[in-house]
Amino acid sequence: MPVEVRPVRARRDVTTFVRLPWRIHAPGGPWVPPLVREQRRTLDRRRNPFFAHAEAEYLLAWRGGEAVGRVSAHVDHRLNAWRGTRWGLWGFFECRDDPEAAHALLAAAEAWLGERGCDRMVGPMDFSVHGPCGLLVEGYALAPQVLEPWHPSYYRALVEGYGMTAAVTTLKWEQRLSDRARLLPVIEELAERLEPEHGVRIRHMDRRCLGAEVRRFARVYEAAWAHHWGFAPLTEAELRRYARDLRPVLDADWALLAERGGEPVGVALGLPDYNQVLRRLDGRLLPLGWLRALRARRRIDEVRILALGVVPELRHAGVAAGLYVELFRTAARSRVRRAEAGWVLETNEDMNRAMEAVGARVVKRHRFYEKALAEEGPRLRADAAPAVRRAAAQGAADRAHDAGGGAEGLRAAALADPVEGAAGRGGALGVAVGGDGRVGHGGSCSIG
């Protein structure tokens, strides 16, 4: 039977879109079911603040009356204005081992993005690098950690068979608590000099004022990641949502702020691997899922180091060393015996050598793909919400301000009109302990 691709319109289509992964992935395998309620909230254009500066289409592939694949096509106007790009993004990709269906889905996504003037199709991202992103291309036997995607091995063939090529590949590093003796002699001296020589103190986040703490985190996050591949800063509304979402899962022992004179200069965020809990819930907290969750959370023995970053002016002061040492001390006081950190750009040789030097090993690779589209001027649809247009213009204005004038500033200012535009520049996805490649000396982790 032929494949038909249709956009999601009715409420039952949303249910099909959300529930499709349960049909794709074998029970008992590495895939971890997400919470259905949270998936619906993420996709809801009225409730997700991402859509104040973005637009999206959700697509389902049907064969003989049965859904066999899904994908989103979305344009983040704030990202494009911030980076000076014309990217069209794709994500939430799930498909049976059916090349015809995958081709039809990606072709429909490409057509939708092309209609909006995008010159490049980039992904997968659900919806951005601030959430689950990247296609798993190595490490299929391992379960994904919190906020990390998992894909069957045949997805790579489906995507590459459509004509997608690698944009960047990232590494996920595993470290065990037993590596501590090997690690600490290398960086503990840097950490000990941090306060007396640089006036930097490290503390744990205060859950009682989580909103303010998240804003402090965001200031470092934006400074440390500003030029990383695929990055654009979060809006105030998005920060509020992240603060709300983090509250039930945040363990303050794993959330660190480095401060100098009361100002944040470094951050580290590790999340207990709540996928160990979600695996038991099958997507539902009710009626009794919350009881299973309470029991399971006490047995979590892994953590994901989601972010570790330092402001540029202190990247050589040992701030990252201090954060990393404190994370290991936290692990020693907890049940955690294993951590995964990253992602690290595969071509970042200095950083990868540093990770090897502290006893870590690569356990997963994720890849972002791209495909060039027809050359047309970028544009917003005539029916785009006014808020989307304002967000696109504001993103460009912010970028112009940061550029500080000159040719780059003028170019950024021109982007304030989302109908005009220019080809963008790339970036580098820095990662893990230190972006300059020396253990404990700074830089930033990626965030996935």
Model regions and ranges:
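Conserved N-terminal entry element of GNAT/NAT acetyltransferase domains
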Residues: 1-14, 18-23, 186-209, 382, ...
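Periodic, rod-like helical contexts
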Residues: 394, 405, 409-413, 419, ...
